[in-house]
Amino acid sequence: MQAMNWLDQVKWDAQGLVPVIAQEKDTGDVMMFAWMNREALAKTAELGRAVYFSRSRNKLWFKGEESGHVQTVHEVRIDCDNDVVLLKITQTGHEPGIACHTGRHSCFYSVLRDGQWQAVDPVLKDPESIYK
């Protein structure tokens, strides 16, 4: 069990989860925010691809299992408090890569302008054609 000690250093929340930020390795773009449980983080490190925990479905979610938009993980980092994980990834699927279920490059596609949220990044692929 010695090899898994690094997992014990993570400060899991009351539900056994840790917040995760996926950041594109080459551009620095923040792609998405999600959650991982212990099993998801262990599988991510083992497989070199992002595996998250879906709170709504209460199960592991292999990023790209439905869309084909896989995240290859190059590096797993943890913050100074050991309670947030950062994945340095390469996002695949319809260049420049689609991370968001809306068909956009990043889940952070809206900006606050004049007191309103405005979508500023384009839809790269219609989500209807992604999730069949």
From Swiss-Prot:
Residues that bind Mg(2+): 79, 81, 83
Catalytic activity: 1-(5-phospho-beta-D-ribosyl)-5'-AMP + H2O = 1-(5-phospho-beta-D-ribosyl)-5-[(5-phospho-beta-D-ribosylamino)methylideneamino]imidazole-4-carboxamide
Annotated metabolic or biological route of this protein: Amino-acid biosynthesis; L-histidine biosynthesis; L-histidine from 5-phospho-alpha-D-ribose 1-diphosphate: step 3/9
Cofactor requirements of the protein: Mg(2+); Zn(2+)
Entry's localization field: Cytoplasm
Domain of life, per lineage: Bacteria
GO molecular function: magnesium ion binding; phosphoribosyl-AMP cyclohydrolase activity; zinc ion binding
Enzyme Commission designation: 3.5.4.19
Function statement: Catalyzes the hydrolysis of the adenine ring of phosphoribosyl-AMP.
Name of protein: Phosphoribosyl-AMP cyclohydrolase
Native source species: Delftia acidovorans (strain DSM 14801 / SPH-1)
High-level lineage: Bacteria, Pseudomonadati, Pseudomonadota, Betaproteobacteria, Burkholderiales
Protein encoded by which gene: hisI
